[in-house]
Swiss-Prot record:
Keyword Acyltransferase assigned: no
Organism taxonomic ancestry: Bacteria, Pseudomonadati, Pseudomonadota, Alphaproteobacteria, Maricaulales
TM helices/strands, residue ranges: none
Key word Ligase present: yes
Catalysed reaction equations from the record: hydrogencarbonate + L-glutamine + 2 ATP + H2O = carbamoyl phosphate + L-glutamate + 2 ADP + phosphate + 2 H(+)
Organism: Maricaulis maris (strain MCS10) (Caulobacter maris)
Catalytic residues of the enzyme: 279, 363, 365
Region (CPSase): 1-198
Keywords associated with the record: Amino-acid biosynthesis, Arginine biosynthesis, ATP-binding, Glutamine amidotransferase, Ligase, Nucleotide-binding, Pyrimidine biosynthesis
Record-given protein name: Carbamoyl phosphate synthase small chain
Protein function: Small subunit of the glutamine-dependent carbamoyl phosphate synthetase (CPSase). CPSase catalyzes the formation of carbamoyl phosphate from the ammonia moiety of glutamine, carbonate, and phosphate donated by ATP, constituting the first step of 2 biosynthetic pathways, one leading to arginine and/or urea and the other to pyrimidine nucleotides. The small subunit (glutamine amidotransferase) binds and cleaves glutamine to supply the large subunit with the substrate ammonia.
Family, as annotated: Belongs to the CarA family.
Domain (Glutamine amidotransferase type-1) ranges: 202-390
Encoding gene, per UniProt annotation: carA
């Protein structure tokens, strides 16, 4: 299968199954290897591509118009220099137009270049999305050459030989290497980002590729936030006298990251420190208590996913970005399922009944997406405040 646009293509996408899509290259030049997935969000494309959880992936947007609001520094989701290694490629249907937003401080194409993201436009994204939906995510090679000099056969061979996401540890590539305090709070129009509190519960975030908005919302909820590399030890954590710990989002196979992360996470649980896990953090908390994770065929990537909250009985519309999932049937007796995806019934959250531990698979910080789950941060920090004051 080969999909060809006109005029002369300057970019190409080759899938591991031999399929080829020809398009117009933009963003960074060169070749990138990654797992191709589709994202259904209509807005927030800068935040999506800057999410460290997308490290090693090529994002196909189902919404045709991408980047027409440009990019700006305030919407940055990389919480550290290392976290700028996020998505490696982007695929869109329509040509990227000049920015139409007063908030833009650069064009989207320029931003793609600065982030090293190889991008294609003019692709039949509906056909590509159907292929992923029916056959599952697969590895790919994406190329951009301004002169159109692309060796298609070599590109197909590169895609076929690319290592899959299963068994890959990517969190260490996007996690910070040094710890530090985080003081940036919530954003408001005309005011920018607020400054965090000088007192309040101390929250230590283990960084496996944490999104900046997770840190902002923790700060906005009243926590004093410190961030440590994901490879930090329990002694490193205890040295900061935390009232709570957050195990962050991040990319890759949780079982592989867990090889170095689980001993520390288990030690946090053994110390009875209140803990919140998000996305990859949710998966690794599940592994720490004896549950299992598995690769998903298509994954969940978008800003319109319905999740049932069993504790409130309400349906929350949330942002999701994950290619692995917790097998809810393997959760131990002391773990109660709190959230479930209404798309496929997969686990989207649990809590422990004998320890102060909560975990959600979706992204409660959104950015982009609905704000239905912002309360996750308020409840967690509120729980810590109650314990501190008790």
């Amino acid at each position: 299968m080969t999909s060809t646009p006109t005029p002369t293509p300057t970019g190409a996408l080759a899938l591991a199954d031999g399929s080829v899509f020809l398009g117009h290259g933009t963003g960074a030049t060169g070749i990138a290897l990654g797992e191709v997935c589709f994202n259904t969000a209509m807005t927030g494309h800068q935040e999506i591509l800057a999410d460290p959880s997308y490290a090693g992936q090529v994002v196909c947007f189902t919404f045709p118009h991408v980047g027409n609001v440009g990019a700006n520094g305030e919407d940055e989701e990389a919480a550290s220099p290392q976290a700028r290694k996020a998505a490696v490629g982007m695929i869109a249907r329509a040509k990227i137009t000049p920015p139409a937003s007063w908030r833009a401080d650069t064009t989207f194409e320029e931003w793609l270049c600065t982030r090293g993201i190889v991008a294609l436009t003019g692709i039949d994204t509906r056909a590509l999305t159907r292929k992923i939906r029916e056959g599952g995510m697969q590895m790919c090679a994406i190329a951009h050459d301004a002169a159109g000099n692309i060796d298609i056969e070599a590109l197909k061979a590169a895609a076929a030989g690319a290592p899959t996401m299963e068994g890959r540890e990517l969190a260490a590539d996007v996690a910070r290497t040094e710890g530090g305090d985080w003081t940036e709070g919530n954003w408001t129009l005309g005011e920018g980002y607020a400054v965090g509190p000088e007192d309040g519960p101390r929250v230590v975030v283990l960084d496996y590729g944490v999104k900046a908005n997770i840190l902002r919302l923790l700060t906005g909820a009243g926590a004093r936030v410190a961030v440590l590399p994901g490879k930090a030890s329990i002694d490193d954590i205890k040295a900061l006298n935390p009232d709570g710990v957050v195990v962050s989002n991040g990319p890759g196979d949780p079982a592989e990251t867990g090889k170095y992360a689980l001993p520390t996470i288990k030690a946090v649980l053994d110390a009875n420190i209140p803990t919140l896990g998000i996305c990859l953090g949710h998966q690794m908390l599940a592994l720490a208590i004896g549950a299992k994770t598995a690769k998903m065929p298509q994954g969940h990537h978008g800003a319109n996913h319905p999740v049932k909250n069993h504790e409130t009985g309400q349906v929350e519309i949330v942002s999701m970005n994950h290619g692995f999932a917790v097998d809810g049937t393997t959760l131990p007796a002391n773990a109660a399922e709190t959230h479930v995806s209404l798309f496929d019934g997969s686990n989207s959250g649990f809590k422990l009944t004998d320890k102060p531990v909560w975990a959600v698979q979706h992204h409660p910080e959104a950015s982009p997406g609905p704000q239905d789950s912002f309360g996750v941060f308020d409840r967690f920090v509120g729980e810590l405040k109650g314990r501190v004051e008790a």
